[in-house]
Amino acid sequence: MKNRFVLPALTATAVVGNLIVVPAANAAEVGAEGASPSAGSRFSIGVLPDTQFYSRYSTPETGNLAQARYGSEPYLAQTQWLVEHQDELNMNFVTHLGDVVDQWNVEGEWQVADKAVQILDDSDLNYSILPGNHDMDVEGASAHPYDKWFSADRAKAANPETFQERYTAVNNDSEAHIFEAEGQKYLNLALGWRADEKAIEWAQSIIDQHPDLPVIVTTHEALNIDGEGSVFYSDDYGKDLWDTFIKRNDQIFLVMGG
């Protein structure tokens, strides 16, 4: 039986804008002599959820409505803000939750996203990224633009300190990162949109290679919310993800979805 991880300080989180702030804590095994997890100091993880409309309405095709209305491009402004404030927020890592663009077949949207994410590439702020349903032709079987603009080579070059590997399949890119915060290493598994059985097997193999690391799973789809504020699984996929992967791994202490 797997040792159960105790991470009480990490289960209560506060989401503020595009940040998640967590108390740092070392993982401790139940029954380990002298193990007494404590809160310690805090650190931040930058979160970029569903930037699709930032990409869409900053293109020439839309007359760059974002610039016209707000005087800036929101996608670019967000990544610049994250880089500029990383030290004061004690932030070593950013994660994108998918839907990088709104219309996968519009070149201009990818150019906007590329320019914004390049700000992270050029900094020492590492990040993970994953495709959402708007980033691909969900009905097609051919490679999609996501692979061109956000390739494994780019991820590796931009994130030399954290990037571990990329699982690449048609319409199903996932990647693994290990980052450190307050002396504790964390494994981030960024799962592509509706990651299939083989992708989940890959993710499980990464966890098995790192049995002592707390795990953060990021995905575009897990839970949903209705107009009355009730939270529920996103179709069958969210429940399957929970039943076949998340609840079977005590190391997973945080799941974020777009």
Please name every model-derived segment.
Residues G71-T79, L97, E109-A116, S142-Y146, ...:
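Stable alpha-helical elements in mature extracytoplasmic
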Residues E29-G108:
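N-terminal active-site segment of His-dependent metallophosphoesterases
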Residues D50, G98-D99, G132-N133, H220, ...:
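Active-site glycine-centered loops adjacent to acidic/histidine catalytic or metal-binding residues
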Residues G63-A66, N105-E201:
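Extended active-site neighborhood of metal-dependent phosphoesterases/phosphodiesterases
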Residues M1-A27:
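Secretory targeting and sorting signals
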Residues S55-Y57, Q103-E107, M136-A141, K198-I200, ...:
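Extracytoplasmic/secreted cell-surface and envelope-processing proteins
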Residues G34-G46, N172-L189, H210-P214:
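Beta-strand-turn-beta hairpins that frame and shape the catalytic cleft
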Residues Q80-F93, D173, K185-G258:
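His/acidic metal-ligating clusters that form di-metal
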